[in-house]
Amino acid sequence: MHPRLSVVILGALLMACQDTATGSNAQQGSGELAGPPRMSVAELRERLHTEFPTQYAQWLAASVTSEAIGTLLLMNDAPVDIQRAGLLYSLYAGREFAPVFVDGQGGLTHRVQPVIATLLDARQHALPVQQFDTPTLAQALSMYEEFGAILSDVGPLILTRADLDAIDELLASDRIASAADPVDAMMRALFEGDPALAPLPELAASHEARVRAARALAGASAVAEALLMDRALDYAFAQRHFNLFTFDEEPSEEEGQRIVAERLTGTFQALADAPDAPAVQTVLDALPPTLPQYALLMPAAARYREIVAQGGWNEIDGLTLRRGNRHVKVAALKERLQMEGYYTGPIDETFDQALKDAVELYERTHQMEVDGETDRTFWASLNIPAEERLAQIELTMQRWRESRIGDDLYYILVNIPDFHAEVWRNGVRDMRFRIVVGNTQRVCDPRTERMRYANATPLQSAYMTHLVLNPYWNVPRRILEEELIPNLLEDGNYFEENGIEQSEDGTVRLRPGPSNPLGRVKFIFPNPHATYLHDTNRRNYFQFPVRAFSHGCMRVHEPENLMEYLLTQDGQYNERDIERSFERGREDGRSLTTPVPVHVEYYVVRIDDEGYVNFNSDIYKYDRDRLRPEEARNERCEPEARPGMRLVLSEDGRPMVQDAEGNLIDPSATNVEEVIPASDGAGPAAGDYGP
């Protein structure tokens, strides 16, 4: 909690500024005027007579305010919490500590209102307003404006006849020849105490009083200026500046700090250079993610925020209902579905066609089997509190801020909970197709002693570099040990019957063909997890709304359409050539001239093309772990030791199993239960050993 800003607290800063305004080292900041083009004496006289009072006030305010800003940012015990004081000091030093938001005279620049409005609107971006401490900021600005009244008490600067005569005398004297800018010269004379160049006796007499009044305001000016800029940069950081993803090697901590500082510097400079309020707003509007889903989620979050503010919805004890039923629960169901916009008809106790349509819409947007009936799964979903639904939407918005997509114009996005992948090009979604992702089998991690998803499709980004037609499947060691070796121990002819080849070093691969789990094409984006997109010989899984059946790779529903699209965009698609390759059946690699970014990400909430909010399955509990981390911490387990085994060839070329002690096991004469203990983990469907 920030300390209360008051005259007493600001006193420390004001004291630190006491000796800065009138000494020979006074900073001139932005008040210093550039030398104008040479003018006639008459033009100079007119300029000085009309502009000098305004320029003098600006010069004075800039001098003491600039010094106060520098002093505040160097204080170890500053009266307010400036999170980025070191960075701000270097940024303001680059502009001689000239303020961006205050004018040093109790007034605010055109940049303030858009920044304040944006900070107050942070809740619309699912960012906590309290993070930017707007009450303290508002208090600082209010105090600054109150201190501005001190200058008003001194009264406006009005040149006397004696001052005007002195100006005319100066212009008529030889002293004008030594000054590139007469206004600048007289201003320096007043600040640096050179009476020989300050022929304004009446003004000189009131100068000290005006300096004291400006100094009293300077502390409040510095606090308001630094606090507002600090919060503006904090907002920029929270939106996207924190995101350090790069396709290159992950930056070191030092390099990451440099990148963030560079981004914040760019925002600082853009705000300082913005010529008017609309330009400031343009700078601020460019900070949030520009990806389409983010913009669609904002009004959805606002709608659910309003539902929560009105008390949310009540839980309904469910029962199976279908069209034609009459029951008091039907009215409650209609009212409940109406709250989220799924039902728009009258509230009564008849389960009519309109309600059936609404139930089907709810099922379709919540990854259920669509049958229009209210079963146990339906009620469990419907009774999730509104607060939790809002939290899911807001977390999804945060995940979009964390997205690795960046400024890519052409990319493939795999959204794991959505069980779909999309191809985007120049802001347009060219393709959307179903996928199967890693299953939800859980094992005990021996390192953390907590349950984890053994086959979860990893979140990552990499460049797709090539496609392979008629691919071999090189079986990963884990799948070999956990599934193929047990199959071999049960049936000594299993490898031969299923087109599996074994090399002398124990590696195993499946030949191209109808039984190959990779189907007819795979799409390679080299990555540490060795996962990829591919066709499949098990197409029945695509009929299910929740499609978590693989060992981590992503099975594509329309692989040949994706292949045609990618090769066409790459300028090398030839239908007849592809057909001949499939007919030959030999493995055939095709490199992409321009690699395509592939982003595998995790968004539980999605807005569909009709504008409905889709709440998808949190299949790997990643959202749960962030929203309710205590549940994840409680999932402790004891690792189960399993025998390590590998394949070797016998002297006559038959596959043999070698256990951890080096013993050879003949698959044709072994009971698998004697070698491998049964696992109680829920794995893929029987016989589905594909990637």
Regions found by a protein language model. Give the residues of each.
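Zn2+-dependent metallopeptidase catalytic domains
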Residues: 21, 26-186, 191, 196-206
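Generic structural signal for hydrophobic core residues of well-folded globular domains
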Residues: 119, 123, 235-240, 382, ...
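Well-ordered beta-sheet/strand-loop patches within structured domains
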Residues: 18-84, 88, 93, 233-234, ...
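Short acidic, glycine/serine/threonine-rich helix-capping segments at coil-helix boundaries
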Residues: 129-133, 138-141, 145, 152-165, ...
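Bacterial N-terminal signal peptides that target proteins for export
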Residues: 1-6
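C-terminal motif of bacterial Sec signal peptides marking the signal peptidase cleavage site
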Residues: 13-16
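Short, hydrophobic/amphipathic alpha-helical patches that form generic packing surfaces
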Residues: 223-242
